[in-house]
Amino acid sequence: MSKAAGKLKSLKKTVERVTHTSKLKTNIPAGMAAAGPPLGPMLGQRAINIAAFCKDFNAKTAEMKEGVPLPCRISVNSDRSYDLAIHHPPATFFLKQAAGIQRGTMTPGKEVAGMITLKHLYEIAAIKIQDPPNVLLTMQQMCEMLISIARTCGIKVVREIDPAAYGEFLEERKLIVEQQRRELQEKREAKMLRTG
C-alpha cells in the first residue's frame, strides 16, 4: 500500500498544472490600445502585462489607419504569455465605408441609409473571406452573408450607382440623421425631467 501511495505522490509532482482560460474576444481600435478601460481591466483579469500588450498591439497595427476597429482573439498561456490574432475590420465597417455613411439606419427594412454596388460587395467579400472564421465559406456564401448584413444596416445593394444622384441622396440622408439625433436628444431630456 505504501508503494502505491509513493508512486501516486511522485506522479502528482511530475504533472504540470494546466490553466484553462477562455479566449478574450474584443474589438480594439488600430493603433489606439491603451491601459485604461475597457481593455485594461479585461487584460488584468487574465494576468496579462497590459503595457507590453498595448505596445505589441500598437506596433502590429502601426501601418493601418488609426481608429479602425479590429476584432482580436487573445488566448492566454499558463506562463502569462499570450497569443494575439488580429482579424480584418468588421463587415459593417467595410459596408459603411463603401456606402460613404457614418451610421446605419435605425429602422432596418423601412429606410435606406446608403447604397453599394455588387462590385463593392465582391471586394469586401474577398477581404472578409480571409478571416479564420470565414475560411471554409465559399465566395457565394460570403456574398450572401454580406448582403444580409447590409440589409440590417439599411444599405441597399444595387447593380450601378449614379454618382450625382447618390450625392444628393447622401445630402438628404444627412438631414434625416440630424433630425433623428435631435428627436433622440429630446426624448432623453424628457426622461431626465420625469425622473428628476
UniProtKB/Swiss-Prot annotation:
GO biological process, one term: translation
Source organism, top-level taxon: Eukaryota
Entry keyword annotation includes Mitochondrion: yes
The entry's keywords: Mitochondrion, Ribonucleoprotein, Ribosomal protein, RNA-mediated gene silencing, Transit peptide, Translation regulation
KW Mitochondrion (keyword) present: yes
GO cellular component: mitochondrial large ribosomal subunit
Stored SUPFAM superfamilies: Ribosomal L11/L12e N-terminal domain, Ribosomal protein L11, C-terminal domain
Primary location recorded for the protein, binned into one broad class: mitochondrion
Record GO terms (molecular function): large ribosomal subunit rRNA binding; structural constituent of ribosome
Pfam families per record: Ribosomal_L11, Ribosomal_L11_N
CDD domains on file: Ribosomal_L11 (cd00349)
Subunit structure as annotated in this protein's UniProt entry: Component of the mitochondrial ribosome large subunit (39S) which comprises a 16S rRNA and about 50 distinct proteins.
Family per similarity comment: Belongs to the universal ribosomal protein uL11 family.
Protein name: Large ribosomal subunit protein uL11m
